[in-house]
Structures are given as structure tokens and as C-alpha cells.
Amino acid sequence: MGPDLRCFPLLLLLLGLWWSVRPLCAIPKNLTRAQWFTIQHIQPSPLQCNKAMNSVNNYTWHCKPQNTFLHDSFQDVATACNLPNITCKNGQNNCHQSAKPVSLTQCSFTGGNYPNCRYKDAAQYKFFIVACDPPQKGDPPYPFVPVHLDKII
């Protein structure tokens, strides 16, 4: 006799439901919010998006639809946290606009399946807005650290 496959569709449904409620923006285990911000958004030397996005997608096991890399150091981006607070897109008041524009690359997903994700690159020179929070254990010892890239302007 072969295996009873009557429960197989139910198993697939449950797996699909679990995957759909798993947040795509969840911070990977063992990383602080600032460390995850660094992986997703700090890239001092520009790389082509297909290569650069590997480091992001390897944590999430999916092709992230869009991502922006700031071509600056974490330290320089963190200095924005010392500038006046502005309201974030989510209504919180812990966002800060950079003092000057920076070089950045916006990566837009064009096709493929993880791990073979393909992206289009768009080099730009713009201001950024970051959300900042007090550092967690393991973060650099700044009063506030960037934890979310809120907007590019």
C-alpha cells in the first residue's frame, strides 16, 4: 500500500497560510534593527543590484521587490539621527532628514525566483530620511542609530 495522500492538500494549504502571514520585513534573528538596516541599506562602494541584493535576499529567502542602497558609511548616515526630528510616513516622530544628498542606488525586482533574483539599477543623488532609535546591545555606541529607511527625496 502507498502513503495516504488525503492530508497532503491540507498540509500545502497550511504551509501556504504560514508563509503568507510571515512578515516580509521581519528582522532576521540574531540581528538588531540597526544591523539589519546596515545589511539592507549601507553600501559605501556601489555594486550592481543583482549582486548587492544577494546579501539582503539570503536572509529572507525571497526576492525583495525594491531596495535602496546608500553609498555612505553607517557613521555618516547615523549623523542624520542628530538632526531635528520630523514625522515618519507611519506617523511616528523619530525620523530625520540627511543634511546633504548622497549617492544611492535603487534596485527594482524585474524577475526570477530566489536565489536567482534579477534587478534593474537606478543610480541617484538624493536626500534620505531615516528613523532612528536608541542602540541595542551589539550596535555602535551612538546616542541614536538608524533603523529604517523611511523615504528618499
Curated annotation (Swiss-Prot):
Kidney. SMART domains: RNAse_Pc (SM00092). The active site is at 41 (proton acceptor), 148 (proton donor). It comes from the Eukaryota. The record marks 62 as: Facilitates cleavage of polynucleotide substrates. GO terms for molecular function: endonuclease activity; nucleic acid binding; RNA nuclease activity. Residues 1-26 form the signal peptide. Keywords: Antibiotic, Antimicrobial, Disulfide bond, Endonuclease, Glycoprotein, Hydrolase, Lysosome, Nuclease, Secreted, Signal. Glycans are attached at residues 30, 58, 85. Its EC number is 3.1.27.-. It is found in: Secreted; Lysosome; Cytoplasmic granule. It holds the Pfam family RnaseA. The record marks 64 as: Critical for catalytic activity. Substrate binds at residues 64-68, 89. One of its GO terms (biological process) is defense response to Gram-positive bacterium. One of its GO terms (cellular component) is extracellular space. Disulfide bonds join 49-107, 63-117, 81-132, 88-95. Ribonuclease which shows a preference for the pyrimidines uridine and cytosine. Has potent antibacterial activity against a range of Gram-positive and Gram-negative bacteria, including P.aeruginosa, A.baumanii, M.luteus, S.aureus, E.faecalis, E.faecium, S.saprophyticus and E.coli. Causes loss of bacterial membrane integrity, and also promotes agglutination of Gram-negative bacteria. Probably contributes to urinary tract sterility. Bactericidal activity is independent of RNase activity. Interacts (via N-terminus) with bacterial lipopolysaccharide (LPS). Belongs to the pancreatic ribonuclease family. This is Ribonuclease K3. It comes from Sus scrofa.
